[in-house]
Amino acid sequence: GSRQVRLVGGPGRCAGRVEVSTSGTWSTVCQDRWDLQDAAVVCRELGCGTALEAAGSARFGPGTGALWSYVIDCAGTEESLWECPRSERRECERGA
């Protein structure tokens, strides 16, 4: 299936909680180690320009669906979140 990323729960399409879809099911991204480099890649991928902040702390709500239990570690130069290194986490805090 196609891999997608979106922002939900914010004031517009370029702000909100990060969710990813790997097989048609949307999942909330872990906020563990989520930073401005990760946010920069999502903003670039969505055509939203420069990332202003990496809110974290479930500012836009923790999400209610599935949890994508990977910690993402982008350099900030990637074109897509799917190009970023990631490591699986058994437990993580939802809501980047």
What are these regions (language model features)?
Residues G1-A96:
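Intrinsic disorder and flexible/low-complexity segments
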